[in-house]
A protein has these predicted regions:
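C-terminal hydrophobic structural anchor segments
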Residues: 326-365
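Short loop/turn motifs that connect adjacent beta-strands in outer-membrane beta-barrel proteins
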Residues: 27-34, 60-67, 93-97, 121-127, ...
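Membrane-embedded beta-strand positions of outer-membrane beta-barrel proteins
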Residues: 37-39, 70-74, 100-102, 128-132, ...
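C-terminal outer-membrane beta-barrel translocator/porin domains of Gram-negative envelope proteins
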Residues: 72, 201-211, 215-341
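Bacterial N-terminal signal peptides that target proteins for export
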Residues: 1-13
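Short glycine-rich beta-strand segments
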Residues: 133-137, 242-248, 284-286, 345-352
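Gram-negative/organellar outer-membrane beta-barrel architecture
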Residues: 30-37, 42-214, 314, 381-382, ...
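Bacterial N-terminal signal peptides
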Residues: 12-21
Length: 403
């Protein structure tokens, strides 16, 4: 799990257990504040084992709509020791959302993450999104480039990163948006927190491993979306395509490279919408020389090939497919707000490759699995997914659906 999704994952676990723990509570409505101390126990293929306490505090408005989640937590991690964090999520009408995460661990790790999104800015004519973060992720992994990397090549590093980006979109009509944006990314690799070999030593000649990398990117995006909700949809289709030109400021020989992606998601609900089949296809391509490894396409993690750890396979290009059946189990009340609980068996497959000439059916990896979700519509989705692969199993927790 990468540094910014790790903390969100603990919140997600808490939300899922929240849904499970209040099924027997009587319903009530109206504005209010409630808190739920919950044991936080989780495991991750890259991040180790966690045990501690998280206290989600939920605030609702007079209509029972969720407005805030404040979630302080204290966790002991098997790799980085004690970790304290404050997580704040604010939800407003029209899909506006603000997230702030601040965290520090006993060993190496530090995180500050802020994001704001408004999908209906200026009375719905535009969309606006910006975010900034600084973090040190001490459990990052690198196995080398390509589809054929071995578990025996696993290495560890601390990713010291600063990121900032903005995106401004124009709604051409009710279902079509065109947006432009820019991003800045600063990355340097430092000694990791595990006993694995240091990436800087084991892969010293791979682009992006040595020294500091500064990336400045410009992106144009086309987005077609007929889904009935951006965060917790039950019907519709979404197509996203982007082209991005980047400059690697520290690279004087080959500073410019480009990235492209086309992603298609389609939901097939049953008549009652108690079961929803979701199909996703994703194609990514990177063009250029000496592209840093962390800027290339990757498989593994909480959003694709969920039976492997984050960034298990990395190369210039990627093809991925996923299918998931979201099955409604129960509906209950949390702090006067309606919450749903569902399970989701899934199958992920895909491959990375250096050239499209290298694509071969035998190189597709497959990871079956099952997920559990707690949903406070329309803004909050907490999930825990387990995927199985030839290298064992992996557990991922996060906010929002994987696709």
């Amino acid at each position: 799990m990468d540094s910014m999704t790790a903390l969100r994952g603990r919140i997600a676990v808490a939300l899922v257990f929240l849904v499970m723990s209040v099924i027997a509570r009587p319903e009530h409505a109206g504005a209010g504040v409630e808190y739920f101390p919950i044991p936080a126990v989780s495991t991750s293929k890259n991040d180790g084992n966690d045990a501690g306490l998280i206290v989600p505090i939920l605030k609702t408005d007079p209509d029972g709509e969720l407005k805030y989640i404040l979630a302080p937590m204290l966790i002991h991690n098997s790799i980085v020791g004690m970790r304290g964090a404050i997580n704040l999520f604010r939800y407003e009408p029209g899909g506006r959302e603000m997230r702030l995460i601040v965290s520090a661990a006993e060993k190496i790790e530090r995180k500050v993450v802020f994001s704001y999104t408004d999908p209906a800015f200026s009375q719905g004519r535009y969309s606006l999104n910006f975010s900034a973060s600084f973090f040190k992720n001490a459990t990052a992994r690198f196995f080398g480039l390509g589809e054929g990397t071995s578990v025996s090549e696993e290495s560890n590093y601390t990713a010291r990163e600063g990121r900032a980006n903005w995106r401004f979109g124009v709604h051409v009509n009710e279902v079509t948006q065109i947006s432009v944006g820019q991003r800045f990314r600063q990355v340097s690799l430092q000694q990791g927190a595990t006993d694995l070999p240091f990436t800087g030593t084991q892969f010293s000649t791979v682009d992006g491993v040595q020294g500091e990398t500064l990336i400045f990117g410009n992106r144009a995006t086309f987005h077609y979306d007929t889904r009935n909700n951006l965060v917790s949809p039950t019907d519709g289709m979404a197509v996203t395509a982007y082209a991005e030109v980047n400059q690697n400021i520290r690279n004087g020989d080959h500073p410019v490279y480009s990235r492209y992606e086309v992603e298609v998601k389609k939901l097939f609900p049953s008549e009652s919408k108690r079961a929803i089949l979701i199909v996703r296809a994703d194609l990514q391509a990177t063009i250029g020389d000496q592209v840093p490894f962390f800027e290339q396409s990757s498989l593994g993690g909480q959003n694709n090939l969920r039976g492997y750890g984050v960034d298990r396979f990395i190369d210039k290009n990627l093809i991925a497919w996923s299918i998931e059946e979201r099955i409604h189990l129960v509906r209950t009340k949390i702090a006067g707000t309606t919450a749903d609980f569902e399970m989701a068996p899934f199958l992920d497959t895909g491959q990375v490759f250096n050239s499209f000439n290298d694509v071969a059916f035998k190189d597709y990896r497959m990871t079956p699995g099952i997920g559990f979700r707690g949903i406070v519509r329309p803004n909050v989705v907490g999930r825990v997914d387990y995927g199985y692969s030839r290298e064992g199993g992996a557990v991922f927790a996060g906010l929002d659906f994987p696709y």
